[in-house]
């Protein structure tokens, strides 16, 4: 039963790459760089 369920999940999830590629390529770097920029610009880092 579980082996027949897995291919249907993978077939229905073919649209996920068009969501994850922009998220990994744009959102994650923007969030990381903005956090690091705000962190290094603080007065009381330590």
Curated annotation (Swiss-Prot):
Task: Give the UniProt subcellular location, in the record's own words.
Answer: Cellular thylakoid membrane
| Top-rank taxon, per record | Bacteria
Provide the transmembrane region boundaries: 20-40
Alphabetic keyword roster: Membrane, Photosynthesis, Photosystem I, Thylakoid, Transmembrane, Transmembrane helix
Please give the biological process terms from Gene Ontology that the record holds. photosynthesis
Q: Propeptide at which positions?
A: 1-11
Please provide, in alphabetical order, the Gene Ontology terms of the cellular component aspect for this entry: photosystem I; plasma membrane-derived thylakoid membrane
Q: Name the InterPro entries for this protein.
A: PSI_PsaI (IPR001302), PSI_PsaI_sf (IPR036357)
Q: What assembly does the database describe for this protein?
A: The cyanobacterial PSI reaction center is composed of one copy each of PsaA,B,C,D,E,F,I,J,K,L,M and X, and forms dimeric and tetrameric complexes.
Per the record, the similarity remark reads:
Belongs to the PsaI family.
The name under which this protein is listed is Photosystem I reaction center subunit VIII
Its encoding gene is what?
A: psaI
């Amino acid at each position: 039963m579980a082996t027949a369920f897995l291919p249907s999940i993978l077939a229905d999830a073919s649209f996920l790459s068009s969501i994850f590629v922009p998220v990994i390529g744009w959102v994650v770097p923007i969030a990381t760089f903005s956090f690091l920029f705000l962190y290094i610009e603080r007065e009381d880092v330590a």
